[in-house]
Amino acid sequence: TLVDDAFCEEMQRVGNLSLSISLEGFEEVNDLRRGVGVYDKVMAAMDKLKSHGLIFGTSICYTSKNIETVTSDEFLDMIIEKGCRFTWYFHYMPVGNDAAVDLLPTKEQREYMYHRVREIRGATGGKQIYAMDFQNDGEFVGGCIAGGRNYCHINANGDVEPCVFIHYSSANIKEVSLLEALKQPLFMAYRDHQPFNNNHLRPCPMLENPEILQEMVEQTGAKSTDLQSPETVEHLCGKCADYACQWKEAADKLWEEHPYVHKGYSNYKKK
């Protein structure tokens, strides 16, 4: 919503930026989550980015309520027409004390996403956009990449967190170097445990393996860094336990039918 002509011109000048624009569906659904009027602002921003020849895509959080919409031909054709080159799909994470667990997709819905995203980006019969699923594409990067394996997150307060969805840390970038932050106990525990599951359709230490995140946070003494609503790791992981059990059955069946291990992407700690 901050994109204007001046911003686009600056993007052209630096030449090394692309934007992922948050979008949850069409106007009614999107504005219910993002705020009234945001959908129209996003559409206007896309028009400006396209007119300046810039590369951009969408960042879509899929939930039990919007999965069919955000993967529909109508929706995809719309964002392609607007100029999107890629679309990131992010599985809803029940982070925060007031997170609605009923927004977690069912195992049937998540299995649908597994097949639908591969269909969208298929060389035959697909769409003219590259679709990626942060959760269901774990097989292509060897599972969880967080905790400094290939990625970490720094929040607005400077707390160095293992992932944008995992708000626990014991290091702040204002107080230590990046190297020191990457060596904090929680990150080292991540490296000790990765991959968190040999089935890379169950990659996350929170969503699909909640007992592991709880153990790591408790053993390392990491503190909640949630800026809005600090949450105990027991409360967070408790919301994922039933989901993890339900998804395991479907995920194991999918993995048995379609195993995939990227041999060049196994940069785990030697054990």
Walk through the language-model features, giving the residues of each.
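Structural alpha-beta junctions
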Residues: 54, 84, 121-128, 227-231
